[in-house]
């Protein structure tokens, strides 16, 4: 939907004026920029007629090289030539260094544990490096279109978490360009194909790029793109195919401890071999080692298929899980859209066709389709197509909620809820006179906080010191169109509030999400039992807390024997509540309730007597 432009009174908003906006596919291996010109969306080439820009940045003492210029030095200066920066976005240095791949870069950890690259130009972080890739794309667009951009739509993998999405926005901010929206890559592809074909029904978008894999199941209906379910892996892509070949080269050539330069040479050759085998059944790998010896090796497509078979099967498993989440079968999928350069690999297409039961769509260049979809969306958002009723409804992959007493999870936004979304729920205080409340935001499907993923914590202060349960705190979860989560807590009588924008530092891979969902199903019965126990334990604690306060205030209303009976039942409840029997706790609460009924009546009578003291009958 278009962003409305409002003019001052007496000034024209120039509705006929075409506003400049582009879509950018900020990829792991290559990046592209696209625009709608004369009603047609296409990628914009550079002065050398190259549409893609390698996502490579090289730092020297006095310059920063980007794209092919930087890529040319990747073998001779791998330490300062940074590739696949998208893989580093939002990940901790510890996580990066614990991976299987040996990285040639010099790292330092920032205060929050995120990676800092030490280069001849100084210390830089992934956000700054990403901005260097965006700069020439923006410059290319403005030169080609002949003006300043009013905004861009940048695509991101569906499983980028909040920190990764915010980092992408920050990178764009460093270039001085306005981000109209972050758009999930599969959704962008659906826009490109949906507008071209005009189909309605269920479509699968299989997106295998250089560094990430996403599968999205979408329903197209009267211009509405609804993502029914998503899946994928933020650390699986064509780069991993290259790594399998690279490891095979090292084994065959008996390269046990290769230098960074040799590793980079093998990596480049692995990519070339992969691309050659897309068209040919056989090719020869050739690398000159550090000693000047030329190493060669014949590689067949059959061998390559055997090396990558497990990785391709992982993507099919994600497809199967996404279909199950969406509640649709293979037969209901009208088309499968192929996105990403890695979908050119014959084995990938064969496995997808075999699983889906139909030939996948490849009519739009899989390398360009995401950028084209982003350009179409940018054209709409900037107001060039105000009549367009295109809607995008992405979904939340895992439920969002907060911790309540007893370590329980209260889900506020359920998984597979379409975004943008806002949900609110009311909570109250546990203790008399409570003036603050701590909030713990979690993600997951389990019933207990210990089994879910922690996202953020914040505290609401300034709650009026009322009796337990008297204060009303409204908690609102808002997830915007870019998938960023904001949580706000407000005390209703005073209006005092606190909020937090959730920016977790770590993303979730497809395996982790799948594992969390599998665990929730496998432990559903046990989780409900544990939840019921925790709820009864919380209720017991509340009863004992309330009764202790009452005894402290009005114990003089009881005889020694009456108080002894109550305290004995309280001790019994406290003992039973520490054990794992919800039914026994409930029974003990009922026994204590019966034992305190006379005490409650005496307190009520006493309160009425005190309230009426000194009042005449006429006043009453």
Swiss-Prot record:
Pfam family, one: HSP70
GO MF annotation list: ATP binding; ATP hydrolysis activity; ATP-dependent protein folding chaperone; unfolded protein binding
Gene3D superfamilies xref list: 1.20.1270.10, 3.30.420.40, Actin, Chain A, domain 4, Substrate Binding Domain Of DNAk, Chain A, domain 1
InterPro entries: ATPase_NBD (IPR043129), Heat_shock_70_CS (IPR018181), HSP70_C_sf (IPR029048), HSP70_peptide-bd_sf (IPR029047), Hsp_70_fam (IPR013126), ISC_FeS_clus_asmbl_HscA (IPR010236)
Keywords from the UniProt entry: ATP-binding, Chaperone, Nucleotide-binding
UniProt keyword Cell wall biogenesis/degradation present: no
HAMAP family, per the entry: HscA
Protein name: Chaperone protein HscA homolog
Source species of the chain: Shewanella pealeana (strain ATCC 700345 / ANG-SQ1)
Gene transcribed to yield this protein: hscA
């Amino acid at each position: 939907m278009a962003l409305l432009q409002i003019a001052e009174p007496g000034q024209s908003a120039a509705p006929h004026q075409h506003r400049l906006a582009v879509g950018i596919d900020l990829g792991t291996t290559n990046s592209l920029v696209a625009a709608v010109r004369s009603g047609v969306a296409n990628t914009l080439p550079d002065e050398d007629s190259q549409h893609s820009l390698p996502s490579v940045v090289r730092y020297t003492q006095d310059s920063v090289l980007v794209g092919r210029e930087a890529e040319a030095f990747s073998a001779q200066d791998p330490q300062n030539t940074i590739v696949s920066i998208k893989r580093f976005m939002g990940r901790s240095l510890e996580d990066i260094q614990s991976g299987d791949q040996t990285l040639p870069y010099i790292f330092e950890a920032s205060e929050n544990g995120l990676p800092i690259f030490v280069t001849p130009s100084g210390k830089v972080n992934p956000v700054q490096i990403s901005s260097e890739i965006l700069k020439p794309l923006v410059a290319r667009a403005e030169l080609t279109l002949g003006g300043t951009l009013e905004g861009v739509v940048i695509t991101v993998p569906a499983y980028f978490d909040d920190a990764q999405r915010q980092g992408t926005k920050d990178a764009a901010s460093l270039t001085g360009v306005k981000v109209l929206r972050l758009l999930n890559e599969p959704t962008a592809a659906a826009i490109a194909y949906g507008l071209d074909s005009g189909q309605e029904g269920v479509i699968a978008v299989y997106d295998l790029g250089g560094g990430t894999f996403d599968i999205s199941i979408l329903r197209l209906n009267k211009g509405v793109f609804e993502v029914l379910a998503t899946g994928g892996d933020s650390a699986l892509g064509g780069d991993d195919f290259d790594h399998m070949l690279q490891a095979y080269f090292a084994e065959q050539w008996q390269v046990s401890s290769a230098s960074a330069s040799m590793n980079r040479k093998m990596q480049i050759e692995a990519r070339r071999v992969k691309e050659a085998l897309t068209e040919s059944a056989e090719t020869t790998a050739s690398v000159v080692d550090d000693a000047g010896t030329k190493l060669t090796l014949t590689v067949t497509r059959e061998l390559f298929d055997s090396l990558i078979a497990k990785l391709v099967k992982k993507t099919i498993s994600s497809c199967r899980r996404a279909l199950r989440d969406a509640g649709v079968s293979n037969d209901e999928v009208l088309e499968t859209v192929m996105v990403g350069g890695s979908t050119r690999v014959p084995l990938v297409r064969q496995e997808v066709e075999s699983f889906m039961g139909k030939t996948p769509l490849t009519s739009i260049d899989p390398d360009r389709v995401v950028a084209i979809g982003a350009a179409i969306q940018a054209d709409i958002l900037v107001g060039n197509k105000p009549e367009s009723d295109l809607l995008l409804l992405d979904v939340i992959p895992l439920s969002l909620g907060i911790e309540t007493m007893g370590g329980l999870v209260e889900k506020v936004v359920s998984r597979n809820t379409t975004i943008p979304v806002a949900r609110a729920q009311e909570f109250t205080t546990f203790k008399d006179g409570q003036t603050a409340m701590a909030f713990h935001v979690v993600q997951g499907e389990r019933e207990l906080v210990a089994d879910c993923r922690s996202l953020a914590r914040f505290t609401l202060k300034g709650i009026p010191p009322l009796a337990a349960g008297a204060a009303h705190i409204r908690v609102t979860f808002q997830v915007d169109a870019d998938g960023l989560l904001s949580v706000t807590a407000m005390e209703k009588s005073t209006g005092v509030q606190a909020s937090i924008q959730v920016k977790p530092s770590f993303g979730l891979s497809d395996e982790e999400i799948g594992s969390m969902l599998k665990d929730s199903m496998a432990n559903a019965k046990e989780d409900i039992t544990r939840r019921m126990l925790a709820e009864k334990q919380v209720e017991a604690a509340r009863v004992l807390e309330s009764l202790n306060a009452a005894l402290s205030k009005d114990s003089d209303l009881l005889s020694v024997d009456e108080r002894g009976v109550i305290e004995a039942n309280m001790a019994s409840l406290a003992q039973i509540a520490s054990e794992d029997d919800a039914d026994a706790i409930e029974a003990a609460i009922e026994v204590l309730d019966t034992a305190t009924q006379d005490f409650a009546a005496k307190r009520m009578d006493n309160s009425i007597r005190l309230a009426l003291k000194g009042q005449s009958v006429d006043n009453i």
